[in-house]
């Protein structure tokens, strides 16, 4: 049994109404036929997905707080906002691992180094299936660095560093993230981890919002017309038992609105796995992918 602090959502609430129509788009650089639309219960297969993970703030801290987080609220208003999204535990590290590998690995505290070898994870499954993956960490001293901390960089927020099946070349500093003229070169799935000041861990909500706007708003706009997706979520709330967090999907053919099905990191992982036809890893197995937010 996995440790989870999320609420329980009645099964009846996840009925047929939660299966909206969707389309499939083939990742750039992956051999494929032209994009086609599939059955109504499908999940889009985007050319590019960028996942951004913020730190230690609850749903109510962010959503509606247009003074400190105007850009994040713009994304929430224009994209799909999951209003019943929960982290799985405390503290930070196991939540990152839950979203990346479907497992908290029994952690009850942040640890470095945490060596999980070739345990299957989202990145390794993408690579094995012929897709591409990269993790971009702000402040990482160099590609593939195994250092635990360096300035405002902390490896505990970059879960791929814990696995030997993610090549060093796929563990990059954020400075290597493509410029706006070259977003088409992005891997199939990217994770972006701001540093401790820019992800709300040490810095303010306003600082994190400004960083996201400055560094990824151009990608978000580009995504809406280039078969791509941005996911912005949080590792955990501010250490309450409720552990409700914002999760926002923004991009092409995301159906604007608020969605109240109960989700956690495992459900988001399951959605990405089904998006690319990957094997389910860890506790994402049997979880419900998100199917009702797509046009």
What is each stretch, according to the model?
Residues 1-31:
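Secretory targeting and sorting signals
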